[in-house]
Amino acid sequence: MHNIHRRHFLKAAGAVTAGLITANITASTHANSVAPKPQNGKSVIGLIAPKMDVVRVGFIGVGERGFSHVEQFCHLEGVELKAICDTHQTVIDRAVAHIVKQNRPQPTVYTGDDLSYRDLLSRDDIDIVIISTPWEWHAPMAIETMESGKHAFVEVPLALTVEECWQIVDTAERTQKNCMMMENVNYGREELMVLNMVRQGVFGELLHGEAAYIHELRWQMKEIDHKTGSWRTYWHTKRNGNLYPTHGLGPVSQYMNINRGDRFDYLTSMSSPALGRALYAKREFPADHERNQLKYINGDINTSLIKTVKGRTIMVQHDTTTPRPYSRHNLLQGTNGVFAGFPNRIAVEHGGFGKSYHEWDMDMQKWYDKYDHPLWQRIGKEAEINGGHGGMDFVMLWRMVYCLRNGEALDQDVYDAASWSVVNILSEQSVNNRSNSVTFPDFTRGAWEHAKPLGIVGA
């Protein structure tokens, strides 16, 4: 939703913090055993929902991110925008006006209080729900969406505690409904090209990946009463770890077939001092301003290392505070070579275009000509026209709708969502325990060993 009152944030964040304290007291180091919970339903790996001639969509939250999804859905065929819900009238009016302007029927509106979304969920003419709300609402809304018989599509991150992750997994298995965390970066042109190259063996056997969310967002602290900064800022006062791991980690996980033949085993994490936000507040706000009364505890830079069961390593970084250029790293090293992003560059020992692997090949066009992903070949021009983070948003939503209308499994499932998001919690636990390792829960309950690998992904 566009806005959440501060008291609701503080209540939710306080509960999260209390849960973390308990977890940190009881957690051990690498010996920390995370036994799978009893299963209450069939695994949803490869879940295929009955084909939908038309995908009927409801939106919970149509503020900044949610409105972007509304815009993109208006460009898609085979969808009906049935209803929207938000607590902020201005963004409701904007969304309705845009939908009508696109010559689509006016959606039903639900508003009034924080629980108005339940009226939307009570309808029987909605197939999927797009959830774009502050983080603390993601888990309860996703669970209630599936309980209401609908498929849940949730903004990142999926959840804020290990228990929430398990509750969502359990609900998906019991209801046999999809719960996809909408990790849009997996649908970027470069990321999908690398996936294509990996599946064709260009880099050899995979050894190591590097992922990040490096995005200077101090300016969001000036969003006091509404917009993302009005609630996101407070997380820097409540947790110390990787607050936002999935943008970089999602693509690297799919390159490595995490939860489809390999899985995360354990993590170790450490944070730098937390200095930048307090300095920014002192510089940009009056001394008595609310932003100067907060105690910022989240380290400006968090670095985590993940070990997989097959022995691969992944470095994951988070930094939304320091003055530096944007990066997600997107580095993948194999036995035959390496791809690195920001800027994009490649070095391979065999199968390249004549350059030595001792120097970077930064001429990407010839690599696109040979390995551009089938999805981008098919709808890349539409994606570039419709935009959304360079087109990745459009490709993601197009692919979601395609799978639902054609009876195909989604590219990301609830186990991916839980595994990528839980880095938030586990990094916090490790930081608070002198960077000792913390074991990942196996949300698949062992099914990862026999799950079919993710293919090149096409349409």
Swiss-Prot record:
Q: What class of enzyme is it?
A: hydrolase
Q: Which cofactor does it need?
A: NAD(+)
Q: Spell out the Gene3D superfamilies in the cross-references.
A: Dihydrodipicolinate Reductase, domain 2, NAD(P)-binding Rossmann-like Domain
The enzyme's E.C. designation: 3.2.1.-
Q: Return the cofactor note field.
A: Binds 1 NAD(+) per subunit. The NAD(+) cannot dissociate.
Q: Name one Pfam family in it.
A: TAT_signal
Q: How is it modified after translation?
A: Predicted to be exported by the Tat system. The position of the signal peptide cleavage has not been experimentally proven.
Q: Which residues does substrate bind?
A: 213, 232, 244-247, 326
Q: InterPro entries per the record?
A: Gfo/Idh/MocA-like_OxRdtase_N, Gfo/Idh/MocA_oxidrdct_glycsds, Glyco_hydro_109_C, NAD(P)-bd_dom_sf, TAT_signal, TAT_signal_bac_arc
Q: Which PROSITE patterns match?
A: TAT
Q: Which residues bind NAD(+)?
A: 64-65, 86, 135-138, 155-156, 184, 244
Q: Which residues form the signal peptide?
A: 1-31
One GO MF term, please?
hydrolase activity, acting on glycosyl bonds
Alphabetically ordered keywords of this record = Glycosidase, Hydrolase, NAD, Signal
What does the protein in this record do?
Answer: Glycosidase.
Which protein family is it in? Answer: Belongs to the Gfo/Idh/MocA family. Glycosyl hydrolase 109 subfamily.
How is this protein named in the record?
Glycosyl hydrolase family 109 protein
Which organism is the protein's source?
Answer: Shewanella putrefaciens (strain CN-32 / ATCC BAA-453)
